[in-house]
């Protein structure tokens, strides 16, 4: 039986009716003797102080100024005598078994430092969908939800401060809340990461529900709330080196694309651009036997993710990958940031096991907000939720599908994530659809596409076979004709050819130069230069490549550039000497 005592700390600033409801629910649903109740009042003026002064079971601190949330909590924490400390908003009503269930989780392991419940209203992913519309219905919902026999605990990166239960020994080790975040916001994220860096785990008790009215302090002042959020977010980024929202939010939408039949299978999961590891934690919650791997270029975020799995600091586009190592690879909104997503996907594909799967999220370039911004000559970045400053390229749905086909994936499925639109926005969308003569405008409201693409069971693709044939001199003309046809219909491109050539045990420069010559004959001029550049990366003094480059440049009248390549040929023969003579004559 758990005999631990909890110090419950509540801050108040007006809103007496919420405070009364909160404290009455604590008295009703929490056994006497198991808790200490501390209230810190930040100079309320609505009768709250008078009411608190009348309560005999509450230890109250009456501040003579509004010191804000972090400092007020710290005042209460310094007075606490419990084995654990619970930071609780006054706009909360607690429910049957709430504290017992959270304590059961908190003390189930020495590694756990703090726990929190789910609720109906929270700025983050502790919010769940509820089926009630009145408080009376809420009690019935909570009594059914808070089941003592079914623990459902999920390890998390951060907990929201509306209800956070912390071991006293963790507080002693980590310290108090950072008052730099006064009057409030981001202090709970900061404290969560401090707990993590000190070696403690954070757990979300999914089997505990309490009701949260939500933001009574700032809810009536949305502009002030936004200013505070922006200011404290900047403070958080300056302190930690990453964005609390972007780097700590799990991509549950991508994890949901995994095969539920794999729930207890031993698997290797790689998250490229894993940030602080929130998505990897969500994978572990749903697939407990999964081995977790990540790649993250932000070293500060990677240091957090490294507490969760095997994380490498680096750029996912340039890092090397182990062949056939992973069952799933997660790409959350990173393909649009790649310099060469075709080459990247072709490389990553080789790191998948046969039948391995890519789970990707890609912003939709044809979203109505992007089109509207273009028409209004507004910036596409910043406030626009579609794009950020790291975006290098845009993808429509057809381009997304072609990207995966060209990279050698099959069984490519997609799901649209749509946003709600206003009446005015819908009118704009309808006008766009009418303009292009389309009855289907779903792509205009799709914020992003979720992609599930499986590597072909036959890892030896048709392109690899064609390149092998060219290397061996087998039906070269027919093979090149087939490849030119594939280039023209968009099923392959030069980046895919180069990345595939680099994976094969062939004479790479021979094959690249044969293709360059044949593409010239077939008029595929845009695909020649990338092939010749790729060949020079292998050997910058390669005779055939230098000669073919010079010949191509001479044919389009770029003789000065052609001369540069001819001069790099160390031993000229009759053919290169003749070309040099023609180039020099043109330059006279």
Language model region names:
Residues 70, 126, 134-137, 141-169, ...:
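A recurrent flexible, glycine/aromatic-enriched loop bordering the glycosyltransferase active site
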Residues 85:
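Short aromatic/hydrophobic "clamp" motif used to bind/position activated sugar donors
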Residues 24-34:
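Short, acidic, metal-binding catalytic loop of nucleotide-sugar glycosyltransferases
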Residues 126-127, 150, 339-347, 357-478:
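S-adenosyl-L-methionine-dependent methyltransferase catalytic module, highlighting the catalytic core
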Residues 96-131, 364:
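Conserved donor NDP-sugar-binding/catalytic core segment of glycosyltransferases
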Residues 41-50, 65, 274-277:
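A conserved acidic beta->alpha catalytic loop
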Residues 101, 157-175, 180-209:
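A short, conserved alpha-helix in the catalytic core of glycosyltransferases
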Residues 63-80:
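Glycine-rich, basic loop-to-helix element that forms the pyrophosphate-binding segment
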